[in-house]
Amino acid sequence: MARAKKVDDNQKEIVQTFRDLGARVRVTSSEGNGFPDLVVQYRSPMNRRLQTLLVEVKDGSKPPSRRKLTPEQEKFHAEFICYIVESVKDVYELLEINYCD
């Protein structure tokens, strides 16, 4: 049975960062059953290739024990390529954009 999915405190900031960088974002955190929090579509300025990314948001300010994947998420990640993003810097790295603090 699917559990109610908690939304990480930094998800709004992560979503806004993706959008500010030109990505389309669909928030899917309510899907449950291990499905990632975000579906992100982004066209790389380097090669103009359109990419669709499955992204799990974890709050990097929490201790590692609070950032672990649930068993359902682990199963989903074993079947599909998913990316874990814990910070704005991670968004830049995932999209291969230079991050300036």
Sequence positions of predicted segments:
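Catalytic phosphate/metal-binding cores of nucleic-acid and nucleotide-processing enzymes, i.e., regions
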Residues: 1-101
